[in-house]
C-alpha cells in the first residue's frame, strides 16, 4: 500500500522531473490533507494561500464524488482541467485512497504527460 513518505517522495520527484513545466505536485488523502509535495522553485503563485486551500478541497471533493459512478462506468484514471494560466491534473493512487494533484504550465503536452504520470504511478 502506498502510504509511506518514501513512496510519496518517489512519485513527487519522478513527476517533477518529467518536465520543467510542472509547477506543483502533491499527494492528498481523501480529506484533502497534504501528505507530501511542493512546488517548483522560482514559480509565481497565481492563488493566495487561502485560495490554494480551497482549490485543493475542491479537487479532492470532485475526485471522490466521481467515484459514485465507478460501478457503472469504471474507475477513473485521471481528471484534467485547463485554464488560461495552468493545467490541473488529478490521478488516483491505486493502492490507497490518496490522490496526486499536479499543476503545470498550460503549454505542457498533456497526452504524453498523462501517459508518463500513469506509468510512474503504476510502477510504485
Q: What are the functions of these language-model segments?
A:
Residues 1-124:
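Non-catalytic interaction/Regulatory regions outside core domains
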Amino acid at each position: 500500500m502506498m502510504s509511506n513518505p518514501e513512496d510519496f517522495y518517489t512519485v513527487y520527484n519522478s513527476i517533477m522531473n518529467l518536465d520543467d513545466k510542472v509547477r506543483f505536485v502533491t499527494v492528498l488523502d481523501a480529506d484533502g490533507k497534504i501528505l507530501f509535495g511542493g512546488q517548483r522553485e522560482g514559480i509565481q503563485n497565481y492563488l493566495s494561500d487561502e485560495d490554494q486551500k480551497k482549490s485543493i478541497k475542491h479537487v479532492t471533493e470532485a475526485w471522490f464524488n466521481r467515484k459514485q459512478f465507478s460501478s457503472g462506468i469504471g474507475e477513473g484514471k485521471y481528471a484534467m482541467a485547463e485554464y488560461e494560466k495552468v493545467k490541473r491534473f488529478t490521478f488516483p493512487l491505486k493502492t490507497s485512497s490518496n490522490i496526486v494533484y499536479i499543476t503545470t504550465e498550460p503549454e505542457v503536452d498533456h497526452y504524453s504527460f498523462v501517459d508518463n504520470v500513469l506509468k510512474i504511478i503504476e510502477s510504485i
